[in-house]
Amino acid sequence: QTAIAAGSSSRSSKLIHGGLRYLETGQLRLVRESLHERTILLRIAPDLVRLQRFHLPVYRSTRRQAWQLAFGLSLYALLGGFAPGAGFGRVPRREWQRLDGLETRGLRHVLCYHDAQTDDALLSRAVVRSAQELGAELALPARFTGARLAAGGVEVRYTTPAGERACHARVLVNAAGPWAAEVARRVEPAIAVPAVERVQGAHLVAP
């Protein structure tokens, strides 16, 4: 509403990933779609999205066995279409000491895999800039106030500092993130939308 990437888009985990943890809940389709998007972004925006290596240490006290994690990583790679450079493997014992900050007492295995990292705000601005180059118009700051669906498309209403405005479009894309349900409630006639579940997560990134 106020600026590009002013909300969740600049407060994400900074990762472009398939959601390794979603394999536990059987959300294979979600993981596959996310990994497909990761592959596309790595190809079209290599200056903004790059592969990042992750390590999974397995200790005597670790709840999951190494073979279970290896199976999950192999499924992750399979769903990702075995993308070049995004594979997984085991880190040899002789290389453990090179991993800064890794506690080696009780350590039994170290697995590694790859996902992608980005600057989410820069990526969002790049997407908007690309859309403008293809003919899109940007209204900012602006607040969506409502829309009416019709056979010929959709009439969209929004406000700017200059007052209320309206435009006609063939398609309305609801990309409001956490506010998607609020946006949907302002569309007439009422449409059924899936419930939006707000979740929180954290990734610690150390140089």
What is each model feature region?
Residues 16, 191-207:
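Central beta-strand plus flanking loop segment that forms part of the substrate or channel wall
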Residues 1-11:
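Glycine-rich FAD pyrophosphate-binding loop
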Residues 162-171, 175:
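Core beta-strand elements of the Rossmann-like FAD/NAD(P) dinucleotide-binding domain
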